[in-house]
Amino acid sequence: MARAVGIDLGTTNSVVSVLEGGDPVVVANSEGSRTTPSIVAFARNGEVLVGQPAKNQAVTNVDRTVRSVKRHMGSDWSIEIDGKKYTAPEISARILMKLKRDAEAYLGEDITDAVITTPAYFNDAQRQATKDAGQIAGLNVLRIVNEPTAAALAYGLDKGEKEQRILVFDLGGGTFDVSLLEIGEGVVEVRATSGDNHLGGDDWDQRVVDWLVDKFKGTSGIDLTKDKMAMQRLREAAEKAKIELSSSQSTSINLPYITVDADKNPLFLDEQLTRAEFQRITQDLLDRTRKPFQSVIADTGISVSEIDHVVLVGGSTRMPAVTDLVKELTGGKEPNKGVNPDEVVAVGAALQAGVLKGEVKDVLLLDVTPLSLGIETKGGVMTRLIERNTTIPTKRSETFTTADDNQPSVQIQVYQGEREIAAHNKLLGSFELTGIPPAPRGIPQIEVTFDIDANGIVHVTAKDKGTGKENTIRIQEGSGLSKEDIDRMIKDAEAHAEEDRKRREEADVRNQAETLVYQTEKFVKEQREAEGGSKVPEDTLNKVDAAVAEAKAALGGSDISAIKSAMEKLGQESQALGQAIYEAAQAASQATGAAHPGGEPGGAHPGSADDVVDAEVVDDGREAK
């Protein structure tokens, strides 16, 4: 049975994990790291770089490098590169393809099935966009799982049979979630979840960038925001400073040649940022995590003293101010330090993949929908059919009627959110039910059914009870991608995968050819410079020289088959040279032996290693017969 992987598709970094003998293993990428930067770059030579290679060239290729694309999932955002538009699911698919390749290299087999995580507070549009990204990457997405739920699954499964309440505080690179779960006897049940899809480590970085821009403007009078390369260097320096301030009280930010003044003299940025100053300029961001926490506690109706464990998820929770706030909110409870905040979500996703594949037994995951779902009714009111924190999958129906006499159709507008006025919530989609027979208002009965699947994706049906006519919508407007769009993107992704494979093959062949040319040239040079001259005829060496020249000429072009052919010919000539050297050495040895027989000078000494003695191998302690 083909294996399934668990993928944490993060804003800043992504991780892939797989079950090995029932235990989750985090897969290292081709660069040797267990986390892959969620960055995609389009090099000017047409190559698509993903992960650390993309991050390494970001400063010199700002306009063609995409980071934090997760923040655009479910929107109509796109970026144009070389005249072609790329949507957020397409960019995310590049990251997923890289993780897929790394997992396949580790396992030595093809991967198609995956469980992908999303922030718990992602709406339907964002979940659908994530599923589309998986599909474009060539993955069969078994399930979309909430990140805090995956973390609790990874943390809580081995904590015994006793029922426990776990609070997961998840602050990542771009999103924030807090969830309260109950775990016991193999059942993982989410009681409530809340969050902010636009709050994460990126925002802390931006505050440091703004602080540096203001400081530099104050000392030099130059506004760095107009210089894209300078801003990219500031972003990287800000992230580094934030990380350093988690373990130090202050950090130096030194960026030489950040820009030039009016006289073209180079200017340097050199600032000292203390942890106290960093916490001061980011305090309001930290305070934004309080409301979702309080919302979860209120929704579950339990007190903080009843929480058994607090689990921190996401790299941003390493900031001391975040840890201190969590301790304050939970009444002094010490957060659990036994999990890796960068990897625990992917580990939980791999466990859920194991559950769905039957590798992990006796585990039931009960997740919830993070936001209420409903339709717009008369007066623009949001009428909820499914309340937030309802366990999924779920199905709810409610009967509505017409607002006007002889109304021939009804427009069903589906919203997600907590506001009382429908227009203030997120419009997921709309559809029309037509063919309603003429009747006074209030007489027709229209049954509206909401069905949320295990991925948290919504299906809505409207049915006229009188005629039996019905219409259904599967909410897809969020990603803005039709089936045709997705199919086209899958083909594009496959084409790029083939291009990438060819590029890798070409690089391997070139490397082999260059190595062979270098070694052969060195060998020929040694022969010509040998004491007493070369042992082989000059015409043999000339043939090798010609083959080397042919290989160099092929390497100067782009025809991979010509390089292979030249390398093959050079290999043959090199072998012929080796054979000639061996034969020359053998002939010289025989000539020397004939001139100096026995123990004479130049001959073999009696008892030397050249004497051959017949003997039997015998066990120790026994005589030879």
From Swiss-Prot:
Disordered: annotated segments: 586-625
Modified positions (Phosphothreonine) in chain numbering: 175
Compositionally biased residues, Low complexity: 586-598
Top-rank taxon, per record: Bacteria
Molecular function GO terms recorded: ATP binding; ATP hydrolysis activity; ATP-dependent protein folding chaperone; fibronectin binding; heat shock protein binding; protein folding chaperone; unfolded protein binding; zymogen binding
GO terms of biological process kind: cellular response to superoxide; chaperone cofactor-dependent protein refolding; chaperone-mediated protein folding; positive regulation of plasminogen activation; protein refolding; response to antibiotic; response to copper ion; response to heat
Classification via Gene3D superfamilies: 1.20.1270.10, 3.30.420.40, Actin, Chain A, domain 4, Substrate Binding Domain Of DNAk, Chain A, domain 1
Keywords: ATP-binding, Chaperone, Cytoplasm, Nucleotide-binding, Phosphoprotein, Secreted, Stress response
Function: Acts as a chaperone.
UniProt name for this protein: Chaperone protein DnaK
Encoding gene per record: dnaK
